[in-house]
Regions:
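Mobile cap/lid helix-loop segments that gate and shape the active-site cleft of serine hydrolases
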Residues: 38-63
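C-terminal helix-and-tail extensions that cap enzymatic domains
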Residues: 1-15, 23-24, 28-35, 62-191
């Protein structure tokens, strides 16, 4: 289905050869995607992993339900103005499921900082500037508080990579695991 949809989208944009697709500008590809989405042929999220039976045998949801995903701590999150406003509900459901399967925790976050400048939103992936401390590479007028948030987030992600806990060795830190009995989402924003 993904290949058929991709071909249909490229054909409609006049990009019928591999050479034409490679030569297309990002703006042309974005316009082709927008025009294809406007046809209403796609329901739900169009940019999801393609389950082809070779590289990916099942969806993440199926693998989680079957308990065939890695038995490790997980950190999952979204942004305040994400394209899927119900993302948090899915994260809570995943955390509740994992709680029945393993003792490893799930940590949930929501990035709430609406970026300065235009667009003034916490759009999908806007937390990446902070996670990787690349604020200085952006055209946006970030403040000292933004740099403090980036430092805090870098500490959380580094601790999670090292210890499986964003609080590091302090297992009783401020970022609690997301559980069925005690749902918890760390809201990341400037103070």
């Amino acid at each position: 289905v993904a290949e058929i949809m991709g071909k249909e989208m490229m054909d409609a944009a006049g990009l019928t050869t591999l050479e034409a697709m490679r030569a297309a500008t990002p703006e042309q590809l974005d316009a082709a995607f927008g025009a294809f989405m406007a046809t209403g042929k796609v329901q739900g999220l169009p940019l999801v992993p393609h389950i082809d039976g070779r590289l990916l045998g099942k969806s993440f949801t199926e693998a989680a339900t079957d308990n065939t995903i890695a038995d490790v701590p997980y950190m999952l999150g979204s942004t305040l103005d994400d394209m899927m406003p119900t993302m948090g509900e899915g994260i809570d459901a995943f955390a509740a499921l994992r709680e029945t399967q393993t003792k490893n925790p799930v940590y949930a976050y929501r990035f709430d900082r609406r970026l300065p400048g235009e667009p003034n939103t916490a759009y999908h992936s806007s937390e990446l500037w902070f996670m990787f401390k690349t604020l200085k590479n952006s055209r946006r007028p970030f403040t000292a508080a933004d740099y403090e948030l980036a430092d805090r987030m870098m500490d959380y992600w580094t601790n999670f990579a090292k210890f499986g806990n964003p609080n590091g060795n302090n297992v009783d830190g401020e970022w609690k695991p997301d559980t069925k009995e005690n749902p918890f989402t760390m809201h990341l924003d400037i103070k």
